[in-house]
Amino acid sequence: TRAMLAEKRGDLPGLEQDLRNIIEREPDNAAALNALGYTLADRTTRYAEAKALIEKAYQLDPEDPATLDSLGWVNYRLGNLAEAERYLRQALEKYPDHEVAAHLGEVLWAQGKQREARKVWAGALEAQPDSTILRGTLLRLTGSEKL
């Protein structure tokens, strides 16, 4: 879709507009609500708006691991670390993905749980050793791409 192409090009305004157009036509499209909410949480400081979109997606599909990850990430951005950890653990349990593991590890790290964060990252790196997301998170937080 155009929204995905806009994301690949780094066109945040285009991505946002395309997702808003989808939501306008399909107000209960949980995937579009979550995609827009996550994008805002990850790439802007519009956290309240992001959280409202993600929470609507969650109400529509509370079992979706991508939405659980987004809820965790937006709560992290808002400083709600315990809440962020809870959602990210649920997401990782349902979908053991390298990006979710990077997010959970970062939240654990921010809470001073470095040993636990490293354990989460190690498990994810074992499954996906070429993950640039995990390596980038490690480098940013620990100063090294290696555990």
What residue ranges belong to the model's regions?
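TPR alpha-solenoid repeat register
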Residues: A32, T67, V100-A101, L134
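Structural marker of alpha-solenoid helical repeat scaffolds
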Residues: R25-E26, L60, E93-Y95, A127
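Register position in tetratricopeptide repeats
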Residues: T1, K8, D42-R43, R77, ...
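Residue-level recognition of tetratricopeptide repeat
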Residues: M4, N29, Y38-T39, D64, W73, D97-H98, E106, S131, ...
